[in-house]
Curated annotation (Swiss-Prot):
This protein's encoding gene: WRNexo
Protein role: Has exonuclease activity on both single-stranded and duplex templates bearing overhangs, but not blunt ended duplex DNA, and cleaves in a 3'-5' direction. Essential for the formation of DNA replication focal centers. Has an important role in maintaining genome stability.
Pfam families: DNA_pol_A_exo1
Name of the protein described by the UniProt record: 3'-5' exonuclease
SMART domains, A to Z: 35EXOc
Organism, as annotated: Drosophila yakuba
Amino acid sequence: MEKYLIKMPIKSKANAVPEEKAVVKKGTPKMTGKVTKKDTPKELKDKENAGEDNTPKQTKGRPGRPAVKRKNLDNPDAKAEKKATEEENPPKRRSSRLTRSTRSMAEDGSPSPEKEKPEKLPFIKYKGAIKYYTENQDIAASADDVLQWVEKQKDEVVPMAFDMEWPFSFQTGPGKSAVIQICVDEKCCYIYQLTNLKKLPAVLVALINHPKVRLHGVNIKNDFRKLARDFPEVSAEPLIEKCVDLGLWCNEVCETGGRWSLERLTNFIAKKAMDKSKKVRMSKWHVIPLDENQLMYAAIDVYIGQVIYRELERREKAKIKNEAEFKENNGEAAFKAMKTLGETFLTKINEVTL
């Protein structure tokens, strides 16, 4: 026996302890604790079926908030509570009353005057001559012809429609004044393209500053300021002092208010529509030559300006005459009382008897 005991290798206790520690390291107490605390999938399923799982479930919305169960409306108590709440605070219901628009659509007959659709106005058709010049000497010769025509007129005041065009870019802003258009007679419009001009011809400057010439347009003062910035030989102040803004004049004669555009003024006074195409309005006015659409656009602007001036002039004369007759028949006090009504004088002047 001793023989066999001597030959067989026997492990010492010192060697056995590290092996036990190594086994313990493979399964640490933390790992074993987690495993023991976790429930198996089968146990979790059993708890869920038994109603023991109180862990809040994640829902869409704010994380970590438990889902709120809706009230069971089949319950008689819940129905009674809902009915009592509605009686105390009745829900807002859409009114069955017809609105102005639906009522006017439902009723037979014409709509109310304030809701009537605006009348479709016919577009302006200009059939007169268009004289278009691009070179300095041609512009000077044309301006001289117009100047001589003005001096031959017997009237003390010669109205002249005036307008300007220039290119515009959203990146660089407005360009230099490129076109001047004028009209002294509804049968002919003059268009002067300034692209090749470093300086305006002296005769053109003399024409627009002539004492008999009354320049007119819509927002015309800003045109003169721009022209003076682009061409220093033009002084803006004398032109501004003697010009006529058609929008302001319309407010005085027709007793209207607000600011006017040429398009709206054309609708109101001339009962015509303008084709204010953005493609033409924002086109390259400095490029020579202008095409037919540009020429017609520029000519119509001053042509209709001359038409509006003549119509406002006629209305002003009629208004002055009617006011004088009213004062003569009813007295100054009645005239002042009439003016305080705030209505358009010409439409009410014959309806009041004092």
